[in-house]
């Protein structure tokens, strides 16, 4: 870790566009990328591969501290690559089974602490784009630029609906909207690291904005802070 390397945190709820914006910005600047939300899935997947029980806090803590993972920003319109121990696991960690495992390991305090340190280790020159829910409030509270990206629940459900339909999945817009509202409530009401903007975050509502318009606003903030 290089504590002097600049960090841009991009937090926000599911479907706000933060992952897309983070990936494009990292690619544009040539900075490192951290998808913090994927780390719990990666840990659950890695634990299963190594025969580690998902309730064994000590072994999970050790695995978390040494996760060999790299996030590669994708070209526009494509998904980012997630490389675990040299293998592309971008798709396999998105299964329901891995997701259930991720929820289990995320409930263990020692694992959360180990992953907190692992996330901070991504901070290297020339800089880091950190995408998540508590990047600006918990993981990188000293980041020189913090962005909190949101959009209406209806717009986020619509985006997710189009994404899943594009993959050929049979989904209901109303059920997706219900899921997003339920997740928003869980994220904002949880006792540990609730979803909320940092006091010094730039808040952007992307409901009526294109990805390029969001990027333009962030570029302006970067220039004002002499970060690029």
Swiss-Prot record:
It catalyses: CMP + ATP = CDP + ADP; dCMP + ATP = dCDP + ADP. ATP binds at residues 12-20. It comes from Pseudomonas putida (strain W619). It comes from the Bacteria. This is Cytidylate kinase. Its EC number is 2.7.4.25. InterPro entries: Cytidylate_kin, Cytidylate_kinase_dom, P-loop_NTPase. Keywords: ATP-binding, Cytoplasm, Kinase, Nucleotide-binding, Transferase. PANTHER family: CYTIDYLATE KINASE (PTHR21299:SF2), CYTIDYLATE KINASE/PANTOATE-BETA-ALANINE LIGASE (PTHR21299). Transmembrane segments: none annotated.
